[in-house]
């Protein structure tokens, strides 16, 4: 894998550069590349280019036929190096990791912009898969394997993390709290008083519960932080699940309860009835896989308590959408739905203080 040299701009990638790179990665021997085609793809927080490759006869069977080049500009607000480390460093020792193979990555040491060249799985996997029973089990299993690799204080530290202390939690809460008044104003006429009271109760009482939970390190890991359907690659005809885009913002919690990645997905992105039908099965599978992968000190009751603790964090995500006026208006279709789902889960699980 190439880490020490800049990756060319998509319109400057040519056959000699790509041939040398693939040979360095051990997936191309003497045969060369016949043709490449580079096309831009839409993306929210990055520039994406798809590189399709045709080889001379006799190329190695594992030589990639398509690659994705992701470029993130300086000033995007993400934690420096996090995504590059996700693809190119943190999980290299995790056998069969649920992460696309990375062929090259580079971070600009001056401004923090970065590029990642990875395998393109779009021919075998889909994004935004509608949740079902098997989907939920496979996502839970893959997520448990990822979490176990960074599970507990010792492994968290090996990945340059630490369990969030009060100062980190204070910064997180202070950031999302900026959107609270705007959220309440934007929903002044279209949410019931019960929801309004619940939102206020969450911001008043829930942070203390988060602080108290950090006194016990059990259940903490390096979290992905954005396990949404668009970041889950699900196999079309069998195979493993992959997770894309660990891109925490500078205010995000990068180390937190592992089950928070599942509450984020199921509460925020699944229809309420889908969540109600599937969530316990998904949580049971996640817990089984934690145990099967070596976690011995995290009981089922504690996992359920942690899941319940993490549900109100979806309201923090909604409040964060309301900080900037353009997001508040442009993304109302999304955050209003997320709020509704969060409130149903909040009352389903009895999360009130």
Question: Language-model segments: which ranges?
Answer:
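Conserved NTP-binding catalytic cores of kinases and kinase-like/nucleotidyltransferase enzymes
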Residues: 1-113, 235-241, 353
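Regulatory N- and C-terminal appendages and interdomain linkers associated
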Residues: 1-43, 56-64, 154, 210-217, ...
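Active-site acidic catalytic loop and adjacent metal/ATP-binding pocket
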Residues: 40-58, 204-258
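Glycine- and acidic
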Residues: 72, 125-129, 244-247, 264-272
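Active-site activation/catalytic loop segments of kinase-like enzymes and analogous catalytic loops
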Residues: 85, 251, 255-294, 311-331
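AlphaC helix (C-helix) of the protein kinase catalytic domain N-lobe
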Residues: 87, 143-146, 265
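Conserved structural core of kinase catalytic domains
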Residues: 104-138
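ATP-dependent phospho-/nucleotidyl transfer catalytic cores
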Residues: 125-224, 235-237, 334-337, 345-352
């Amino acid at each position: 894998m190439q880490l020490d040299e800049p990756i060319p701009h998509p319109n400057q990638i040519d056959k000699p550069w790509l041939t040398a790179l693939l040979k360095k990665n051990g997936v191309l021997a003497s045969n060369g590349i016949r043709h490449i085609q580079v096309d831009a793809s839409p993306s929210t927080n990055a520039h994406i280019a798809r590189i399709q490759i045709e080889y001379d006869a006799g190329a190695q069977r594992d030589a990639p036929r398509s690659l994705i080049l992701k470029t993130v500009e300086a000033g995007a607000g993400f934690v420096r190096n996090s995504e590059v480390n996700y693809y190119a460093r943190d999980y290299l020792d995790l056998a069969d990791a649920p992460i696309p193979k990375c062929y090259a990555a580079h971070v600009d040491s001056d401004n923090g912009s970065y590029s990642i060249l990875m395998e393109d799985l779009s021919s075998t996997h889909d994004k935004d898969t509608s949740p079902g029973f098997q989907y939920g089990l496979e996502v839970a299993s893959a997520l448990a394997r990822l979490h176990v690799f960074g599970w507990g204080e010792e492994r968290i530290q090996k990945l340059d993390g630490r369990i969030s202390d009060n100062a980190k939690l204070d910064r997180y809460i202070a950031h999302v709290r900026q959107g609270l008044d705007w959220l309440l104003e934007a929903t002044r006429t279209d949410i019931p008083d019960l929801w309004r009271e619940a939102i206020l109760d969450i911001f008043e009482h829930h942070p203390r519960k988060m602080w108290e939970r950090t006194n016990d390190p059990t259940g903490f890991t390096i979290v992905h932080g954005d396990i949404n359907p668009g970041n889950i690659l699900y196999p079309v005809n069998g195979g493993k699940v992959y997770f894309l885009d660990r891109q925490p913002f500078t205010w995000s919690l990068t180390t937190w309860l592992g089950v928070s990645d599942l509450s984020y997905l199921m509460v925020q992105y699944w229809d309420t009835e889908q969540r109600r039908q599937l969530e316990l099965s998904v949580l049971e599978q996640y817990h089984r896989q934690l145990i099967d992968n070596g976690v011995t000190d995290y009981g089922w009751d504690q996992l359920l308590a942690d899941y319940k603790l993490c549900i109100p964090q979806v309201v923090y995500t909604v409040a964060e959408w309301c900080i900037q006026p353009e997001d508040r208006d442009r993304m109302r279709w999304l955050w209003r739905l997320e709020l509704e789902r969060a409130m149903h889960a909040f009352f389903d699980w009895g999360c009130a203080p």
